[in-house]
From Swiss-Prot:
Entry keyword set: ATP-binding, Kinase, Magnesium, Nucleotide-binding, Transferase
Family in the record: Belongs to the pyridoxine kinase family. PdxY subfamily.
Organism lineage: Bacteria, Pseudomonadati, Pseudomonadota, Alphaproteobacteria, Acetobacterales
Family annotation (Gene3D superfamilies): 3.40.1190.20
Residue stretches in coiled coil: none
GO cellular component: cytosol
Subunit structure: Homodimer.
GO annotation, biological process: pyridoxal 5'-phosphate salvage
Protein name: Pyridoxal kinase PdxY
HAMAP family: PdxY
Cofactor annotation: Mg(2+)
SUPFAM superfamilies (UniProt xref): Ribokinase-like (SSF53613)
Molecular function via GO: ATP binding; magnesium ion binding; pyridoxal kinase activity
């Protein structure tokens, strides 16, 4: 399995490719990592050093990869935070190049726009880029509840609201190949206190998975869930199984992180959770 992952990179900690690449490699995937930035640490610390790469830099790296003649072997493209319109455009150009070489390749887009309580935290114009250009190109989307609501204009108070919003979003996605949406964090009227729901949609079917809500809010968790879900969907061909495997692994990762009181997810220390999760969760038809 070969996955082209175009995301940010940090020297210290685990966000973007620094969160996604190691679990994917541990599970057996070859990862072709293209970094959109190289920072000392994630921006949640308030200060950092490093470089932001431009769209031309990404295009040059993609040309080099294409020159090796390997794009027909690429099974999927994974993208997350897009730092600028130029980077977003270069990522979508990369998706087009991969699909030209392998029409069966999937594009998994984590539409990083914002979050409940924080609102939109990306640059002006990027939410619209996701909505108008990335979503119509994607086979797999992994929004959180805030992003689902923003992309569709539907407020999700109940599970029925969330299902309706997901169907609206699915209609905006690519027509060729699968159309899969994973809502990575959902809290609606039916969600018990102290719990967190995840909702996945494929082929007209919805599955809900519920875990305890852990006392941790940490950068990089969304990058990990998107990468793991993509891997397991490629591996099993089934969104329900992919959700169960990815959610179980990330729960174990975050539980270990919370117990340690760490400011960074313990991607390496908790590596066994990616292979054999200590707690397994199962999704139900909803």
């Amino acid at each position: 399995m070969n996955i082209l992952s175009i995301q940010s990179w940090v020297c210290y900690g685990h966000v973007g490719n620094a969160s996604a690449v190691f679990p994917l490699q541990l599970l057996g995937a070859e990862v072709w990592a293209v970094n959109t930035v190289q920072f000392s640490n994630h921006t949640g610390y308030g200060d950092w050093t490093g470089q932001v790469f431009g769209g031309d830099d990404i295009a040059a790296l993609m040309k080099g990869i294409a020159d090796r003649g390997v794009l027909p072997r690429c099974d999927a493209v994974l993208s997350g935070y897009m730092g600028s319109d130029a980077i977003g455009g270069a990522i979508l150009d990369a998706v087009a190049s991969v699909r030209a070489a392998n029409p069966e390749a999937l594009y998994c887009c984590d539409p990083v726009i914002g979050d409940t309580g924080r609102g939109i935290f990306v640059r002006p114009g990027l939410p619209e880029l996701f909505r108008d250009r990335a979503v119509p190109t994607a086979n797999i989307l992994t929004p959180n509840q805030f992003e689902l609501e923003w992309l569709t204009g539907h407020h999700c108070r109940t599970l029925a609201d969330a299902r309706a919003a997901v169907k609206v979003l699915a209609e905006s996605m690519i027509r060729q190949g699968p159309r899969i949406i994973l809502v990575t964090s959902l809290h609606v009227a039916e969600t018990p206190s102290g719990s967190l729901d995840m909702l996945v949609y494929e082929n007209g079917r919805f599955y809900l998975l519920r875990t305890p809500l852990l006392p941790v809010s940490i950068n990089g968790a969304g990058d990990a869930i998107a990468a793991l879900f993509l891997f397991h969907r490629l591996d099993t061909g089934d969104a329900r199984q992919a959700l169960e495997k990815a959610a179980s692994s990330v729960y174990g990762l975050l539980k270990r992180t919370a117990e340690a009181g760490s400011m960074e997810i313990l991607t390496v220390a908790a590596r066994q959770e990616f292979l054999t999760p200590s707690t397994c969760f199962y999704a139900q038809i909803c």
